[in-house]
């Protein structure tokens, strides 16, 4: 595997912004545009499955991309710096790591047409509570027993992460867990396209092989929208 950091060249910020906005051939507001743009770093025949994960962050007002890939990227544009190094984590049972994860927490369910679908865990929990009270909308719930939005986000998303951790060979230290930036991303027609949440904290390695696989393949869904990349580093 390879780990890459993509940052705009300070001497070419305008060109970098133009390349990011239009290099994918998609609308700059399209959440899928980053994915299409980063594909340019991995030239391959048509039909090749995606073999990279990415995450977009902003520091000092400038975007940066973290990318984990099965192949080394090929820099395509002078306006962006691409720093790449081999990524072969050496993990042991009991090792503690700091982690960051932007994920799309969903559960399986059935949509209004009776077909199988994925549902955002927060929205699913709200729907269940409203149904139990015979209410249609969250704003209709006026009682003192109405849960706080952030409490619901933390409870439902942390439960989702705990289940994912069991599948992927690690255990989250609940005392260090942060659940932030719950966002419902909307598509071009203003409908909700997907949701994301940022997790951070410390974890303990239980199964190195499973965790290494998760570092390369990601956790959860919406990977084409910048979710699923688990970033780890030693606890110092």
Where on the chain are the PLM-derived regions?
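RNA-interacting cores
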Residues: 1-236
């Amino acid at each position: 595997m390879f780990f890459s950091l993509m940052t705009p060249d300070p001497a070419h910020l305008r060109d970098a912004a133009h390349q990011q906005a239009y290099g994918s051939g998609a609308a700059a507001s399209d959440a899928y545009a980053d994915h299409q743009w980063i594909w340019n770093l991995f030239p391959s025949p048509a039909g090749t499955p995606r073999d990279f994960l990415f995450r977009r962050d902003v520091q000092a007002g400038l975007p940066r991309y973290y990318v984990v890939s099965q192949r080394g990227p090929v820099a395509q544009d002078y306006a962006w710096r691409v720093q790449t190094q081999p990524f072969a984590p050496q993990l042991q049972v009991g090792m503690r790591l700091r982690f960051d994860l932007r994920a799309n927490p969903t559960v399986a369910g059935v949509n209004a047409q009776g077909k199988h679908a994925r549902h955002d865990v927060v929205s699913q929990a709200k729907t269940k509570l409203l149904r139990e009270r015979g209410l249609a909308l969250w704003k209709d719930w006026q009682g003192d027993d109405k849960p706080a939005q952030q409490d619901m986000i933390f409870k439902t998303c942390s439960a989702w992460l705990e289940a994912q951790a069991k599948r992927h060979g690690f255990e989250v230290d609940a005392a260090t867990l942060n659940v932030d930036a719950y966002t419902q991303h909307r598509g071009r027609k203003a409908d909700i396209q997907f949701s994301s949440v940022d997790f951070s904290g410390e974890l303990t390695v239980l199964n190195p092989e499973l965790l290494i696989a998760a570092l390369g393949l990601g956790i959860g869904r919406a990977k084409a929208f910048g979710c699923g990349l688990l970033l780890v580093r030693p606890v110092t």
